[in-house]
Amino acid sequence: MAMKKNGKLWKYLEIEKKPLKGLMGLEWVILVYTLITLIITLFCFTKLQHPDAMIWGRIRICAITIAMWLVYRLVPCRMMKFLRIFIQMSLLGWWYGDTYRINSLFPNFDHIIARWDQQLFGCQPAMLFSEHFTHPIVSEVLNIAYVSYFPIILVICAFYFFERYNQLERACFIIVASFFSFYLLFDLFPVTGPMYYYKAVGMTKIAHGIFPAIGDYFCTHDEMLPPPGWTDGLGYYLLVAIHEGEHPTGAFPSSHVGIAVICMILAWKSQNKTLFFSILPFALLIFFATVYIRAHYVIDVFAGLIVGIIFYLLWDKVAKKCNF
C-alpha cells in the first residue's frame, strides 16, 4: 500500500525545507581527527605496523563521508541525515582499533595506573572485585551492563531523531566529538587495562604489588585474561563476542564511563524522564562493570567520569557557538 504523504512515516522521507548544505559538525570532527592522525602516520611511517592500511582506511572513510554528503544533497530528508550519522558511528570501532596502531609508538603506561590504584586502595580492585563476587546473578548483570554501552548510544540517538529532531545534530556532535577526544588521548597515552596488563606480567606479581614497566610489549602481544565470573550466561557470551574484536588500548580514561555520563546528560537534557530513568541503571552499572571484567582500573573510571563531564561541557559550548 502506498505511503500517504500525511502519514507518520512520511515526514522522515519528505524533502526538508531547509536542508543542510555543508558537512555536519560531527563530520568535520572526524575529518580533523583524520588529518591529525594522518600527519602522525606519515611522519612515523617506518615505525608503524601496516601504515599503508592506516592511510587507505582514512581515504576510504573520507570517501564515504563525501559520498553520503552527496547522496543527502540529492535526497535531503531526515532519514538520509540519520543514515549519515549512523554510518559514521558504525565506524567508531575501526577508529578505536586504529588507536592501538598509533599508540604503539609510545611505551606502555599500565604500570603507572596500576600503581595509582594500589596506592589509593591498598590493593588491586580489578583483581579482587570478580574474585569476591562470583554469584552468577552478579556476573550476568554486570556483563550485560557492560555490553549495553552501544545500545545506550543508539537509544539516545534514535530518541533525538524521532522526538527531538531539531537537536539531533547537536546531540550526535557531542557524542562523536567526545569519542574522538577520547581516541586522541588513547593515541598519546597507551594504557591497556588489567585484562591485558595482568596477563602480561602475571597474577603473582600483581598480587604482591609488583608492577613492572613493559615498554613496547603490546606491539607484538594481544593476549588477555578471559572474562571472570559465570561462564554460561548470555552476558558472558556477548562479552566474549565483543572481546573478539578488542585491542590492547583505550583504558585511560574510560570512554565507557565518559560516554555513558554524556548519554545520561543528554537524556536528562531531553526532559524525558522515561528515557533518562530507562538508561540510568545500565549507565551506572557500567561504572562497576568495567572494573569487574578487568577492562579498567578504578582510576580509569574516576578519570572517565571527570573527563566525560568536561567533554560534554566543551563540545556543548562549541555546538551552541556553531549553531549545530
What do these predicted regions represent?
Residues A2-I61, M79-I153:
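N-terminal transmembrane-helix/juxtamembrane module of multi-pass inner/ER membrane proteins
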Residues V138-I152, H247-W268, V298, F302:
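Membrane-interface loop-to-helix entry segments
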